[in-house]
């Protein structure tokens, strides 16, 4: 016959179960876990992160303190500062400008002397700290296809490329009417408004006729993010010194 036996659980299992229950109750008393109950310790993930981040920032501030009194050119000549700046660059800038600062289509080359917004230390600091918005007006509807082709021919001529002389002559008139306000009457650009030099053979998006036509027709809308809030003043200055050195400014 079948009969029911009384088989108690092992003592160690029972004690482990009791300990688990007690631990759970204590946890929910000390820490948040039940509805809006915040726990008697008042602990949150956010507060723990803030404390740990503050401690880390204090260590960083102590490390960066010797660089605070240096100018950008002095930082560019300091090996320790540049080693730190290289780490900052690889973590914050290389994604767009490349590990060597050589840039890519739509992202400026930082390793040459061609500067859209100015290459002096103050201008570089300003660019990194506050970012830049490089808006090129679309002229397709204003000029029409024939007018766009003429301006493209003239811009190619300005930069030493071969183009149709008749179209270039017509494009020169359009250029003086619509383009010179930003790029200047000679096409050499204006750093104050971020208008690039069209005569030096350095191109952000490309210099072939098709790309130039796209640029003139549709315009461009480049944007450089601001890093002041993310990195703080001292790290921005280190990055400025790194970029300044990349471009040969420290030589």
Task: Enumerate the predicted regions with their spans.
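A broadly tuned "polar low-complexity/structure-edge" signature
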Residues: 10, 98, 124, 134, ...
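Gly/Thr/Ser/Pro-rich low-complexity intrinsically disordered regions
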Residues: 158, 205-206
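Basic, gly/Ser/Thr/Pro-rich low-complexity segments located predominantly at protein N termini
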Residues: 15, 29, 103-106, 136, ...
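Compositionally biased, intrinsically disordered low-complexity regions
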Residues: 26, 35-37, 41-44, 100, ...
